[in-house]
Amino acid sequence: MRPLRHPSPDEITLHGILHALADPTRLAIVAALKEQERCVPPDGGDGINCVETMERVKQSLPKSTCSQHFLILREAGLIRSERRGVELFSRLRCRELNERFPGLLQSILSAHAASAPVEAAPVKE
């Protein structure tokens, strides 16, 4: 299999990031990957695969659509993916993104979290 291409930090553009995150599904994927970061070791851990990520985002998409979303995020420089067997495990490139565009990703994810619909609490009878 051919190696995966990841842009260098200098190749990551603001336009590419904003374009990738303009899609609500991709924004939700990035938010899920950011949440996963809190559960793994500081070195970034192993990341999570497409199926696990989509379960976290509570969406059911065809595998090809999911793969396309991850490709766009990878080409924009938002995620780093590693192939293990037939699966790809992805994680955010937070440190590199923050060095290139300080505070950008956190600001976008904070705004996303603030605008997310709040689930109603169950009504007690």
Where are these regions (language model features)?
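N-terminal helix-turn-helix DNA-binding core of bacterial DNA-binding proteins
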Residues: G16-A20, P24-P62, R84, L88-E96
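Short, hydrophobic-biased segments on the C-terminal half of alpha helices
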Residues: H69-L71
